Swiss-Prot record:
Family matches, as CDD domains: AdoMet_MTases (cd02440)
Family to which this protein belongs: Belongs to the methyltransferase superfamily. L-isoaspartyl/D-aspartyl protein methyltransferase family.
Cross-referenced Pfam families: PCMT (PF01135)
PROSITE patterns: PCMT
Biological source species: Cereibacter sphaeroides (strain ATCC 17023 / DSM 158 / JCM 6121 / CCUG 31486 / LMG 2827 / NBRC 12203 / NCIMB 8253 / ATH 2.4.1.) (Rhodobacter sphaeroides)
Residues at the active site: 67
Keyword annotations from UniProtKB, A to Z: Cytoplasm, Methyltransferase, S-adenosyl-L-methionine, Transferase
Family matches, as InterPro entries: PCMT, SAM-dependent_MTases_sf
Name of the protein described by the UniProt record: Protein-L-isoaspartate O-methyltransferase
PANTHER family, per the entry: PROTEIN-L-ISOASPARTATE O-METHYLTRANSFERASE, PROTEIN-L-ISOASPARTATE(D-ASPARTATE) O-METHYLTRANSFERASE
One BP annotation, GO: protein modification process
EC number: 2.1.1.77
Length: 219
């Protein structure tokens, strides 16, 4: 259902969408501008399309979800992306998070273990002319060593601990944002900064994400 079909003006819909995101703590002007430019509706298919502008997670293919917009904004904000940064996203999903990051970074690499998700996200990237995103089928728990090191890494699935291969692929001074914890319990969103010697860990907020699974999916 489009905004015109349900009687809502597109400009009003966008204002309502951004207000919901801001009210939940997303205050970074660049992140808000990126979320204003990227239409979440382009990444939501089927019967849930008319709920694309609500601040809620929604089911997508392969048993995955598209994160609620406020969480996308908060994770992007915590990542503190600079315009010249090279970013790795682990867990392409619908492609919405990578699209938002593409407005903040020089280059975005996004990987997913599900072929269908990579294919469908790539189609949307092409349709929206997002030319600085490369989507690949890969086991994200091992990162993307051929493109490392990265200025920023964003993980959109929960690990029991920050994955060692991903930590190793961060530049000195680089930042990784990752949900950590058991999948059957509330997890913590962690911000990891790589130092000259070791890493600094900061807990940000409770979250709930699907688990980070090793291997390549069959779909």
């Amino acid at each position: 259902m489009t905004a015109e079909a349900d009687g809502e003006d597109p400009a009003e819909r966008k204002m309502r969408f951004l207000f919901a995101v801001r009210s939940r703590g997303v205050t970074d002007a660049r992140v808000l501008a990126a979320m204003e430019r990227i239409d979440r509706g382009a990444f939501v298919r089927g019967i849930f399309a008319d709920r694309a502008y609500e601040d809620m997670p929604l089911p997508i293919a392969c048993g995955q979800t598209i994160s609620q917009p406020s969480v996308v904004g908060l994770m992007s904000q915590a990542l503190a992306v600079n315009p010249r940064d090279k970013v790795l996203e682990v867990g392409t999903g619908s492609g919405y998070q990578a699209a938002v990051l593409s407005q903040l970074a020089r280059r975005v690499y996004t990987v997913d273990r599900h072929r269908r998700l990579v294919r469908e996200a790539t189609e949307v990237f092409h349709r929206l002319s997002l030319t600085n995103i490369t989507a690949l089928i890969a086991d994200g728990s091992f990162g993307l060593p051929e493109q490392a090191p990265f200025d920023r890494i964003l993980v959109t699935a929960a690990a029991e601990d920050p994955p060692g291969p991903l930590l190793a692929q961060l530049k000195i001074g680089g930042i990784m944002v990752v949900p950590v914890g058991q999948t059957d319990a509330v997890q913590n969103l962690i911000k990891v900064t790589r130092l000259e010697q070791g890493y600094d860990y900061e807990e940000l907020r409770p979250v709930r994400f699907v688990p980070l699974v090793e291997g390549i999916g069959s779909d």
